[in-house]
Amino acid sequence: MRVRVRLFASLREAAGVPEASLELPPGATAEGAWGRLVGDFPALAPRRASLAAAVNRRYAAFDTALQDGDEVVFIPPVSGG
C-alpha cells in the first residue's frame, strides 16, 4: 500500500522535503511509516520522542493501522509566544 507523509517545521528542515510517498506492507501502522521515513531520512531519528501523529487530519496513536491512500502527518512540538 502507498501512503503520503507530510512534514512540517523542523521535520521538513531535517528531511529537506515537504512530503514523501511511502510504500508499506498491508497492516502497517503510523509507527511503521515513521520507521520507513527514518530509513529514508536518518536525520529524523532523534525527533521521535516528541512527535504527535495524525492520519487523514485526525490525531492518531502511533499504533493506528494505515490504509492505502492515507495521509500521515508527523507533528513536532509547537512553541512560541
Please provide the spans of the model-predicted regions:
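Ubiquitin-like/PB1-type beta-grasp interaction modules and other compact soluble beta-rich domains
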Residues: M1-G80
